[in-house]
Amino acid sequence: MASSKTFFLLFALLFALALLVSTEAAASEESTKTGSVEGVKDAVCHHGCCRWFHHRCVRCCRSAEEVSVSDTENNAAADAHCRHGCCRWFHGRCIRCCPSA
């Protein structure tokens, strides 16, 4: 009776350890994939992205001045959409309007 309990506890401990190791390996692999994708996105445009379509850059800015003009246009569009301006941007789009000025 005692040996079956010991065997069960040993089996449960080994199963939990294997599950923990596989979870850690999957998490580190996922972070590696995410890091490499972000690096690739940053390497696409030297001066930043001036036109986004479906969360992807479709046109790179030719110069740093063009980036500031593009940001100004985005702010104007967001101000027209949001009563108190845009508080949060994501990929060139306003995703959260400010609650008050």
Swiss-Prot record:
Sequence repeats: 42-64, 79-101
GO biological process, one term: cell division
Annotated disulfide bonds: none
Superkingdom of this protein's organism: Eukaryota
Keywords annotated in UniProt: Cell cycle, Cell division, Growth arrest, Repeat
Segments of this protein annotated with the region 2 X approximate repeats: 42-101
Function: May be involved in the control of the cell cycle at the G1/S start transition.
Sequence similarity: Belongs to the GRP family.
Name of the protein in question: CYC02 protein
The species this protein was found in: Catharanthus roseus
Gene it is expressed from: CYC02
